[in-house]
Design a protein with these regions (language model features):
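N-terminal-biased segments
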Residues: 1, 49, 64-66
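Short amphipathic alpha-helical segments, especially helix-boundary/capping motifs
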Residues: 11-16, 35-37, 50, 68-72, ...
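Metal-dependent phosphoesterase signature
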Residues: 1-37
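Asp-based, Mg2+/Mn2+-dependent phosphohydrolase catalytic module
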Residues: 40-43, 56-165
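Short, acidic loop-to-helix structural element flanking the phosphoryl-transfer center
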Residues: 22-51, 57, 61
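Broad hydrophobic/π-residue packing in well-ordered secondary structure
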Residues: 16, 20, 32, 47-49, ...
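Short, mixed-charge, low-aromatic patches
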Residues: 14-20, 48-54, 106-113
Length: 165
């Protein structure tokens, strides 16, 4: 069995980048349609917003550019920036530190089981958006909702007291 070396790693990375170029991610199909509305709502309420994703920064930036969402986020963090990604809480701990907020001031919106576990381990409140397309286990979330619009309604009713920094 051949040892994994730098040359092989570089070759695989090059192949992966070529594949991604030839098969772009269908961001329009994956992004929840109510994302722009809730981001605008949060901006008007002067809520600090961050994006902490396990995806590569390349993929994150591509999605943000395609949907013109860059201006909403004070902090954007990629899982590539950490030795371990979700469910390890480091991505959320680092993001909260960069935003200058504590776990008790933070609401994490997640859809994945590992993301929910990471948010919980970071000490933050975690709400899950039910996404029936992928069948994620979301039972550990503090609250499950069916859309970002539902989250906006809940935040309006609570006057954002629990997440406003």
């Amino acid at each position: 069995q051949e040892a994994f070396d730098e040359e092989k790693a570089s070759e695989l990375q090059e192949g992966y980048e070529q594949f991604k170029e030839n098969h772009p991610m269908p961001y329009a199909e994956l992004l929840f349609s109510d994302v722009p509305d809730i981001l605008e709502f949060l901006r008007q309420k002067e809520v600090k917003i961050a994006l902490a994703s396990s995806s590569s920064m390349f993929d994150i930036k591509q999605m943000l550019d395609i949907h013109q969402l860059n201006s909403y986020f004070e902090v954007v963090v990629s899982g590539n920036d950490f030795k371990q990604t979700k469910p390890n809480p480091e991505i959320y701990q680092s993001t909260m530190k960069k935003l200058g907020v504590t776990p008790s001031e933070t609401l994490i919106i997640e859809d994945s089981e590992k993301g929910i576990q990471a948010g919980e381990a970071a000490g933050a409140t975690v709400w899950a958006i039910e996404d029936k397309r992928f069948g994620m286990n979301q039972e550990k979330a503090d609250l499950k909702v069916d859309s970002l619009t539902a989250i906006q309604k809940l935040l309006t009713e609570s006057s954002l007291k629990m997440i406003k920094a």
